[in-house]
Structures are given as C-alpha cells and as structure tokens.
Amino acid sequence: MKIYLVGGAVRDALLGLPVKDRDWVVVGSTPQEMLDAGYQQVGRDFPVFLHPQTHEEYALARTERKSGSGYTGFTCYAAPDVTLEDDLKRRDLTINALAQDDNGEIIDPYNGLGDLQNRLLRHVSPAFGEDPLRVLRVARFAARYAHLSFRIADETLALMREMTHAGELEHLTPERVWKETENALTTRNPQVFFQVLRDCGALRVLFPEIDALFGVPAPARWHPEIDTGIHTLMTLSMVAMLSPQVDVRFATLCHDLGKGLTPPELWPRHHGHGPAGVKLVEQLCQRLRVPNEIRDLARLVAEFHDLIHTFPMLNPKTIVKLFDSIDAWRKPQRVEQLALTSEADVRGRTGFESADYPQGRWLREAWEVAQSVPTKAVVEAGFKGVEIREELTRRRIAAVASWKEQRCPKPD
C-alpha cells in the first residue's frame, strides 16, 4: 500500500496559496484492507474512505470508463493493480494531476509542473471531452486563477467548443450548473467565468439571457464601452471588489437583463428595461433553481437600480416607498446591497472605474433617518390598527424630507 497527496492540495501549495482540503490516493490496497486499518467507507459508487483521526478523504486508485451520457455516465474500476499514473490520467487538468509522496517528492506524469510554471490550464487527455461538467470547472479555474495570469490552452478551449457544439452541456442538471456558478461567483474575478463560457459557446446554452446582451448597444454618452454584455462583465468585475457576497454579485450580473428585450429599432435607448428584466431574472432563476433569497435580491436590483441613480430627484414619499418595496424594514441588509450593486453599475464603465457614487451614501443616510422613526411613539400617541402604519409612514416621509432638505443636493 502506498499513499499519495493529490490534486488541489499539491497544486495550491506549489502556487504558494493556502491549502484548504487535502485529498489522498491509496495505491495497491483493497476496501477490506482499508476497513481493517480503521478507515470509514463513505463512497457508494467507488471506494472512498475517511481517515480515523483526520477525517480527510482517502480514495483507492481507480480508472473511469464512459458508459453513458452526461457527467454521471461513468463506470469506475478500483483494484490493487491500478497505478498512480492511471488514477491521475482521469483528472481534468494537468495542474490537478499532480501527486506528492510521503518524502515530499512530486510525481508529475502529465507535465502539470510545466503548465503551472507557464500558467496554463490544459486537459490531461481526450477523456476530458466525456464529462460536460468540466467545461464549467475549467471556466471556474480560469476565474479562480486569473489574478495569477492563468489562461486556457488553445487545444483545451477548442475541445470545450466541440463539447458545447455537440450538445454535451444539455446533460447537465440545473443544480450542478448553479453549484459551479455559485463557486465561480466567490472568486476574485467572477467575470472571467462568464467570458470563458462565451468564448466556448456555452454561455448561449446555459445563460441565454446574459448571452443576449452582447451586441446590444447603450448610449455612448453614458456607456463608453457601448456593448451591454461588456458592461455587464465590467460591472461584475467591479462588484467583486466591493462585496464578497454571492447574492450581491449575482444580482449585479442580472441587473441589465431587460436590455436584451429592447427591439433593435429602439436602440441604443432602453426605456423600462428594469421592470422588463425582472421576468428574465425569474426565468433564469427558475431554470437553474437558484435559491429564493438570491433570486429575490436579483429581482429587486433589476427593477430599482436605475431609480437609485436618480436619487436627488426622488421625493421623500418615493424614497420611503422604495424601502417598502424592497422590504427593508424586515431585511435592512437590502439597502446596503442595493447601494453596492448600483455603485458597481456606475463604476463598471470605461473611464468611470474610480468614479464617486454619492447616491449610495444618500440612500444609506435616508435609510438611517427613516428607520430611526420610533414605532413606539406612534402607538403611544393613540393610533390603532391600520392608522399605526399610516402615521408611521407619514412620520418617516417627514423625517426623510427634513434630511433631504439639509443633506441631499437639489436636482438641476
């Protein structure tokens, strides 16, 4: 029996990055031998065991053979005669097909070290094309390591295009697509994930609502980058610097979906694209089974982001109504989330990357003023039933009006 550290732990250690999870491969052993040594078996489809002390995963070396469609159609073979090289060959990328023995020596049968040095994401073997999930995984790795200047090897991107055009991605379940997307949204450069999907044709298949934005012009006065798809990715890049939250990042990605519905004869204007985008957000989220809380924020951002841009022109009643519409009294975090997504929208434009966004500050200040109006005082004043709500709203509007007179500049 020989045990090797494999995959991401080896890769990230060589890149000087923190190692989160450690996975091990066991060569020359059997399930019974592992059980006798105190390991706990957890894998149903293939032999994976938990170490009795560390609870890290130890998998018997195995090979995989395509036996059906999609990413689940594989037959696994695990036996003492499966070599380490056999096991590493089934992995997706060469940088993930590295192993380390107990002496610290790196085993690299597929030039993963060279690709690490050259910052290349390259597939190990043609078997890559048998698993459509790998298209999403490579796009996610490209986003995860973009800050280290990694790029996808030309032949790997070509294979990803072939897989997409062959209809392989249609075998992916919504849950897997969303899981990879959610993971990509946590990276430092989530926009790279969607750019890679576009480069290989997968964006049109998996995210047609986003793909439809490319080639749709916006007024050059407000959008020097002109193309709405490019603006969307710039905005996603910007919000990744402002917030680590997946729901904020996803909402930003979806903020301009409505512009994809504008008839070409009306370009470059997109009047009413916010409310129009809400339906597309719902469509996308229903198809990918996006969690409700993430969906709800994306709907609100699509509907109201343009309203925040015009904040100085809003009357106090409209401002308080906005807080009602986003359910801020029960979910106050939405005020900050809306401020961040709107700021990213403004700064996600060519030449505006460092722009100030006072509307975000005014929104936050107005919220502090509105929520500081005490409900208790209204009740103690003798109001009952629906009168409490009406009087509370009246007092909130009055408080915001007083604040706006002093703190918010009047529109020209």
UniProtKB/Swiss-Prot annotation:
It comes from the Bacteria. Keywords: ATP-binding, Hydrolase, Magnesium, Metal-binding, Multifunctional enzyme, Nickel, Nucleotide-binding, Nucleotidyltransferase, RNA repair, RNA-binding, Transferase, tRNA processing. Magnesium is required for nucleotidyltransferase activity. Nickel for phosphatase activity. Its cofactor is Mg(2+); Ni(2+). Mg(2+) binds at residues 21, 23. ATP binds at residues 8, 11, 91, 137, 140. Belongs to the tRNA nucleotidyltransferase/poly(A) polymerase family. Bacterial CCA-adding enzyme type 1 subfamily. This is Multifunctional CCA protein.
